Structure formats: structure tokens, C-alpha cells
């Protein structure tokens, strides 16, 4: 709990004083860890600047006592806890990025970017995706990642993710309902 509070305070400081004023820290704890109950039930105000995630396997889920499982489900419903299925690449465990969208080898990195569909004309969407992905791939090599040895080099690990936002705005602009879209 103490380490979580330190990381929460650090993230608050970086978010408020940093150049980009953003950042995210996700604390992960395996469901098999003896402190999982305390991790799940720590009040949001005790860790306001971090997200919490419980890593599970089918075995750990089955081994978890019913009361702790209920607390975990309650925390997920409240938006205080994320759930992450443990993944492996061969025999090596791989970890999710902050948003649990991309799974990485140890010391791996990824760059994420989005296309704002709400700012696009319909016919521009394919070009926006192509240009966005090209920018991400070019940027990865320019970040300096890998030069210190702290992270894998871009030649060994070049993971990028291109997502979308603004779908509701795009649909509204073109008069398409969710029912029609789905």
C-alpha cells in the first residue's frame, strides 16, 4: 500500500508539472498474491492518481475465496479495479501496456495514437489510418528507445497501436444511429 501511495503522489506531481501534463501508472497484483484483498479494497481516495489491476488465470480465479471474488467484482463494477488475463508468449509471461491493449515482452515498448473520426470526412478515413500508422512506425525509431539498454531496441521490438475516438460524432454528422451502424 505504501509503494502505491508513493507512485500515486509521483504521478500527480508529473501530471501537474510535466511538459505534457499527462501520464498513467497502473499497479498490477496477481490474484494469487496474499495482499490481493487489501489491494482490492483500498479506497480510491488513498490512491487517486493510479489505476489498479488484478491479474488472473483460471486457476487463480478458482483458488480465490468467494468473498474476495465478490469484492473484486464490486471494485470492477465501480471502475476502481481492472481485470487482466495473464498471457504468455511460449513460456515467457508478457505484460499489458497501461491500457491493456498491447501485450509486451519484458522491457518492450509501444507507441499509441488515435484517429479522431469526428474530425474526418468519411472518404478521408482510409488515408487517416494509413498516415497515422506510418507516423507511428517512423516515430518509434526516433524516440531513442533502446539506446540506453533499458528497453529493447526498435529493431527488436517495434509495437504500435492505432485506435479511434470520435465515432459518435462521425455517426451523428452523417445521420447514422447506433442501431443502423451495428
Tell where the protein language model's regions lie, with residue ranges.
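Function-dense linear segments that define catalytic or interfacial modules
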Residues: 1-3, 14-17, 75-174
Amino acid at each position: 500500500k505504501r509503494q502505491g501511495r508513493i507512485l500515486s503522489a509521483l504521478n500527480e506531481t508529473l501530471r501537474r508539472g510535466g511538459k505534457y501534463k499527462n501520464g498513467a501508472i497502473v499497479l498490477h497484483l496477481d490474484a494469487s498474491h496474499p495482499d490481493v484483498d487489501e489491494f482490492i479494497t483500498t479506497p480510491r481516495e488513498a490512491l487517486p492518481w493510479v489505476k489498479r489491476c488484478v491479474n488472473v488465470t483460471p486457476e487463480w480465479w478458482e483458488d480465490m475465496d468467494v468473498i474476495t471474488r465478490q469484492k473484486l467484482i464490486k471494485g470492477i463494477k465501480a471502475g476502481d479495479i481492472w481485470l487482466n488475463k495473464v498471457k504468455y508468449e511460449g513460456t515467457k509471461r508478457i505484460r499489458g501496456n497501461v491500457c491493456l491493449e498491447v501485450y509486451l515482452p519484458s522491457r518492450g515498448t509501444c507507441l499509441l495514437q488515435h484517429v479522431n473520426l469526428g474530425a474526418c470526412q468519411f472518404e478521408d478515413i482510409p488515408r487517416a489510418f494509413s498516415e497515422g500508422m506510418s507516423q507511428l512506425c517512423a516515430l518509434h525509431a526516433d524516440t531513442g528507445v533502446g539506446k540506453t539498454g533499458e528497453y529493447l531496441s526498435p529493431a527488436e521490438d517495434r509495437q504500435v497501436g492505432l485506435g479511434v475516438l470520435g465515432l459518435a460524432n462521425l455517426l451523428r454528422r452523417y445521420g447514422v444511429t447506433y442501431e443502423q451502424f451495428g
